[in-house]
């Protein structure tokens, strides 16, 4: 999309609001939906259910299962205003993995929620640990907690002392990751990473490293958090980038189901894990 600066020059927008404007700017369908909603309710707290939020959550659950065709049919029904069909399609099929969604206001808030959920899970149903392993060169937000998880000195130095409970690992260094787990074991409640790092450059995780992260987390009862603000929503060809990178992992034993990730200001988790906390 072309944007015009205050100097009158035209620019091609490849920034997309630092990765969050996945639908572009001024799309007629988006504007129409916004106008229609503002005539009803401007804001509804997460304490309450509204059907549109439920529809989007069902859509995201299908995408999380890599069911693109099912998501497309559901999306068409939602856009067409066919509430009956949308409601029917939103009901999970027998054996379908259900992913629950918590909607947030920003990526940093969603990331903080994921870290809080990981620690809460560890206390209530997991290993009781509170340490989160994060990748050097990653970026997870600008709150104090997410800066602590962002393992880049030039971003952290101005804000020290930072919250504790975070350990740095070099991306794709399986030996270092194993050494961290050997040293800390059940003190670890989560591994947090971007499947493809964005802020520090385009640095994808390898299948081997993703498999190791998931399997090591499984062994100690920890969770895996994938931050997909920069790489999610089909930017890698799949609905979410982690789906390209888990082909080498143990699909029959998916880290006890304890996987959460977030993209564009929302957080997702497998249904059973969310209900445990």
Role assignments for model-derived ranges:
Residues 1-277:
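Conserved N-terminal phosphate-binding loop of PLP-dependent enzymes in the Aspartate aminotransferase
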